[in-house]
């Protein structure tokens, strides 16, 4: 599982270090690589362990090829996916189309989201986090 927020930099080649805690979690789960794709709700990159990606692909393959709405989503988001390996320094190379999609500049933020990880441009992340959540949209995680 992935939790926490980590500030990092991305270099001119598109390389950024995956936080050590995330690398440790991947190693403990026996996950050799991650899949990067467009995050559909914000301008961010979503990173999924290979096993989570495989679950997603299985769902996609079970969908009807005649469902236009589903196919549009597959075309938009699943087709943006790139399998990537970490280099010996624990860095990932974010492909140019994903850097463009998320507007990744020099400063980036890795955010653990439980089973997945998000990668944001720092300015976009700060803006997203400063926005108020309307009271009727707040989820009560502690309700029993």
UniProtKB/Swiss-Prot annotation:
PROSITE patterns reported for this sequence: SPOVT_ABRB (PS51740)
Annotated gene: mraZ
Location(s) in or outside the cell: Cytoplasm, Nucleoid
Single GO MF annotation: DNA-binding transcription factor activity
Cellular-component GO terms for this entry: cytoplasm; nucleoid
Protein known as: Transcriptional regulator MraZ
Keyword set includes Cell division: no
GO biological process terms on file: negative regulation of DNA-templated transcription initiation
Organism encoding this protein: Anaeromyxobacter dehalogenans (strain 2CP-C)
Family: Belongs to the MraZ family.
């Amino acid at each position: 599982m992935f939790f926490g927020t980590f500030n990092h930099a991305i270099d001119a080649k598109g390389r950024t270090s995956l936080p050590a805690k995330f690398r440790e979690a991947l190693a403990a789960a026996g996950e050799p690589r991650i899949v990067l794709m467009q995050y559909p709700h914000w301008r961010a990159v979503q990173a999924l362990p290979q096993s989570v990606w495989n679950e997603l692909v299985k769902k996609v393959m079970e969908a009807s090829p005649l469902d236009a709405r589903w196919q549009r989503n597959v075309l938009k988001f699943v087709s943006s996916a790139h399998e990537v390996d970490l280099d010996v320094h624990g860095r990932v190379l974010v492909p140019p189309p994903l850097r463009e999609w998320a507007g990744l500049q020099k400063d980036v933020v890795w955010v653990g989201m439980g089973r997945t990880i998000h990668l944001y441009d720092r300015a976009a992340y700060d803006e997203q986090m400063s926005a108020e959540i309307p009271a009727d949209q707040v989820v009560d995680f502690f309700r029993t």
